[in-house]
């Protein structure tokens, strides 16, 4: 079975740090924050095998560009699949206006 390199953008890393900080500092739940961070990180690393298992996003032009969405608890991991690598673009809270936030990242 083919294995892909998983590359995480600076924006996605920043998203994960902000998720951790919000839960740990605003909600005062550092253990929960670490658990959430670890679940997201593990899910991202799992994209090294069968990254096509997650659906393409429904909005255009993101769908045509091959952007996929993986749900992890209340968060969405957005990524593309290349020939040998998976590129994680963003990790966003799923209840937010995802299309608007994705388009701002360009």
Protein language model features and the residues they cover:
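Basic, Lys/Arg-enriched alpha-helical interface segments
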Residues: 1-63
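Basic side chains
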Residues: 7, 39, 53, 68, ...
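Enriched for short, Lys/Arg-rich terminal
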Residues: 27, 72-76, 80-106
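Alpha-helix boundary/capping detector
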Residues: 38-49, 66-73, 96-97, 105
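Basic/aromatic recognition patch in beta-strand/loop cores that engages polyanionic ligands
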Residues: 50, 54-85
């Amino acid at each position: 079975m083919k294995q892909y390199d998983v590359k995480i953008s600076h924006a996605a890393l920043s998203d994960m740090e902000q998720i951790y900080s919000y839960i740990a500092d605003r909600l005062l739940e550092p253990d929960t924050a670490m658990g959430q961070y670890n679940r997201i990180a593990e899910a991202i690393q799992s994209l090294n095998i069968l990254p096509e298992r997650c659906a393409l996003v429904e909005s255009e032009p993101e769908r045509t560009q091959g952007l996929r969405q993986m749900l992890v608890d209340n968060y969405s991991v957005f990524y593309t699949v290349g020939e040998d690598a998976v590129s994680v673009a963003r990790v966003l809270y799923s209840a937010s206006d995802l299309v608007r936030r994705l388009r701002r990242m360009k």
